[in-house]
Amino acid sequence: SDVYKRPAHGNQCYQDFNDVRSQFYATSEWQSGYPAATGIGAQHGGIQIDFNAVSGKIGIIPLDNDWQRAAHVYSDEVLISHRPDTEKGTPKFERGKSLSDHQQEVIYISGTAAIRGEESMVTGDVLWQTEITLENIQHLIGLEEGKEKLPEHSGKLELLRVYLKNEKDAQIVKEDLDKLCPGVPVAYLYADVCREELLVEIEGIAHL
């Protein structure tokens, strides 16, 4: 469904989801931060949720990206609500999550788009948005490695999942990512993303 469209009651679908998610997370303390997550539209009715669980022996660290404001502290200016009597819930997810057993480390990369700070990098060019998004992902991994600047990161990306707002963009985005991330498995899905002006969102897993 169109996550930024407003149903009959007038509120944005994605904001409704954020409001309910905020209420749920407020019932407990999240010592390891919020989950790495992607909230995305679907081409069918209803809601589908999947998640991974790990044992208590696994170290879990929330990851921030200094190019992007943490979504769970977004200002009201970028949250769309048409219910003046209701506090806007922020998107409760971390930019990424590091899971480590002291022998290997896996990074779950949340759904990432062409956002810097909390503002969309607005353009009609899906390739430009794709490359800004990939830069954001690479920078997130670079911060986890303690590096200020990144060399090529493709060898450390295990997989990517790309959500495209417009099905017609699939071929050119695939050609672009084949060049930027050679050898990385990429799945392409047609789905709506969280802001009307954004054309692509990418999530993934990196193995360090």
Regions found by a protein language model. Give the residues of each.
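N-terminal presequence-like segments and the immediate start of the first folded domain
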Residues: 1-2, 6-208
